[in-house]
From Swiss-Prot:
Region (Disordered): 1-48
InterPro entries named among the record's database cross-references: Ubiquitin-like_Pup
Identification of the protein by name: Prokaryotic ubiquitin-like protein Pup
Biased amino acid composition, Acidic residues: 38-48
Keyword field contains Methyltransferase: no
Signal peptide range in chain numbering: none
Regions of compositional bias (Low complexity) in chain numbering: 1-13
Stretches for region ARC ATPase binding: 25-61
Biological or metabolic pathway of the protein: Protein degradation; proteasomal Pup-dependent pathway
Organism: Pseudarthrobacter chlorophenolicus (strain ATCC 700700 / DSM 12829 / CIP 107037 / JCM 12360 / KCTC 9906 / NCIMB 13794 / A6) (Arthrobacter chlorophenolicus)
GO MF: proteasome binding; protein tag activity
Gene Ontology biological-process entries: modification-dependent protein catabolic process; proteasomal protein catabolic process; protein pupylation
Location of cross-link Isoglutamyl lysine isopeptide (Gln-Lys) (interchain with K-? in acceptor proteins): 67
Keyword terms, alphabetized: Isopeptide bond, Ubl conjugation pathway
């Protein structure tokens, strides 16, 4: 056995997969700002609803004596 050479398996890291698609290009700035404005409007609406619900909750809590 001393005269036999052992073959080592090749590492998979040395092989490059060419089937991996490239990332899509970044969206234009106009689309990004339009999307951001829509999200901002939605967050403002949610904030308003939460504020009105919080006021009602506090009133109901105080009327019940905090129980």
């Amino acid at each position: 056995m001393a005269g036999q050479e052992q073959q080592q398996p090749q590492s998979r890291d040395s092989q490059v997969d060419e089937d991996i698609p490239e990332a899509p290009p970044a969206p234009p700035e106009a689309q990004a700002s339009a999307s951001t404005e829509g999200v901002d409007d939605l967050l403002d609406e949610i904030d308003g609803v939460l504020e009105s619900n919080a006021e009602e909750f506090v009133r109901a809590f105080v009327q019940k004596g905090g129980q």
